[in-house]
Amino acid sequence: QTLTAPLDIENNLYFLTEGVVRLYFSAENKDITLNIGFPSSFISVYTSFLTRENSDFTLESLTAFSCYYFTHSDLDYIYEHTTCGQELGRILTERIFLYLSQRENSFLLKSPTERYLDLFQEQPWLIQEIPQKYLASYIGVTPQALSRIRARLSESN
């Protein structure tokens, strides 16, 4: 199910309680997965959500999912009229910043094998539920390279 398509203006910030959602863009006839939302995480086309400009990305569910969501106007109202809303905004911003910073550091400092192992440790069930091509894209390798990583890891165990 597509939640946000390219050229849409993102209106929702989702908090997943079940299921998996991915954020991606298409380039040169292939999809590049930027983010995978897991249970207990927020996901959105956040730049479009904040700027109210058209999205360059697609947000789609990979499995059946359940979520809570805030619309842009909901959050504006909460921020303006409640002190806990301001705290919520700060926490959301911090969580998104930390996630992006950790993801960037992962690509700069870790090998694809280490990124795969990190993902496996954080979300072991995901390896079985999500098509390998999306996992490969998420860790920055081709599906063939992911197959080689998995084969090497299973040989060493």
Predicted regions and their residues:
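Regulatory nucleotide-sensing modules
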Residues: 1-14, 18
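Residues that scaffold the ATP/ADP-binding catalytic core of kinase and kinase-like folds
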Residues: 6, 24, 45-46, 77-78, ...
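Short beta-strand segments in beta-sandwich/barrel cores
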Residues: 20-24, 66-67
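Cytochrome P450 core scaffold surrounding the K-helix E-X-X-R motif
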Residues: 25-30
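Cyclic-nucleotide recognition modules
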Residues: 32-91
